[in-house]
Amino acid sequence: MLFRSQDLGFVGTQDGATTVEQLAADLQSHLDRTPTVLPGDGRPLRRLAWCSGGAQGFFEAAIAAGADVFLTGEISEPQAHLSRETGVAFLACGHHATERYGAPAFAAHVCDAMGVTHRFIDIDNPA
């Protein structure tokens, strides 16, 4: 998915639909963080867009891509209004919680390519 001329976000489509409540519960279970949920218009969620960390500014790109829901780490005031106006759900799952898997994966990739080692130190952060 293209966010401001950079291929940073992702869009996925699932066969069956889920509800925003079900998705929020699944994310809370996997990320160990209670998401902030803007439920949109309650439509079944089939097309999901996501970008980890502080990607709330990409919500409009997710809407333009036809997403039923956008998942990211943070939320700002404009996203609340956009969710109400468009009916697209928005879940802010925590900046740290949504990025704690990417950093070790990237480090492992670099280590494999360069023959070095790394140690990831996961310091919990409520943000």
Residue ranges, per PLM feature:
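Hydrophobic structural segments
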Residues: 1-127
